[in-house]
């Protein structure tokens, strides 16, 4: 779908099992790199606070990959199903950048295509201007479909959300200049969150700041695809059924990595 290189961001402790079960199969089709996100992967001058066990978050995960990535790249959650068309769309945009920097992108999904039948979900609701660029993302943490439609159970009561509200599922496209911005943002995060052993540094927070500062623009690419993931264990049967349906339809082979 447009990509031939992949960098897996993992922990050292799972490397052997990961390479044997996933990496070995992927290496037949991609140039594969392994990058390690560990607590002590910190900028110079910082140390891991005593008692910290929680990973530093998605922005930190991307930052540790800086030595493995030297061209425009896409970022995904490893446990989400985005659909092949989303990858083709973002790959086409990245190929068209022709060395430009500060021109990022993301693939937005219709909110109605990202819900769970088994409980509330957290989604980054996107604001988009007339030019098609992102102006900001706001995390809504209690979204579900009700008899009255889709609502977010916020602190100030239920807020209705339109079916076609664009939301981020963490499918972003960046150019390598992102890493310098990412490190600066992460340094500020470490200083501001000192003493908070559970604070995390997220990609959407970083992107929002770059937009607000005028440092970068983020083009919003639209996907009509159905997103799949397992927010609740009860979501898995539906995910499996839909994957089997796509295999029967010839969209995917039964054995993807053979």
Q: Model-flagged regions — what are they?
A:
Residues 1-75, 82-83, 87, 96:
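Conserved N-terminal catalytic core of the sugar/cofactor nucleotidyltransferase
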Residues 30, 84-172:
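Conserved core of the sugar-phosphate nucleotidyltransferase
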Residues 32-34, 104-106, 220, 227:
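Conserved beta-strand scaffold positions in the cores of enzyme catalytic domains, especially
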Residues 39-44, 112-114, 143-145, 227-228:
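A short acidic, often aromatic-flanked loop/helix-cap motif at beta-alpha or helix-coil junctions
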Residues 44-55, 119-124, 234-238:
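Short, surface-exposed amphipathic charged segments that create phosphate/polyanion-binding patches used
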Residues 65, 79, 110, 175, ...:
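Residue-level signal for inorganic ion chemistry
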Residues 130, 137-258:
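Conserved alpha/beta core of the MobA/IspD/sugar-nucleotide pyrophosphorylase nucleotidyltransferase superfamily
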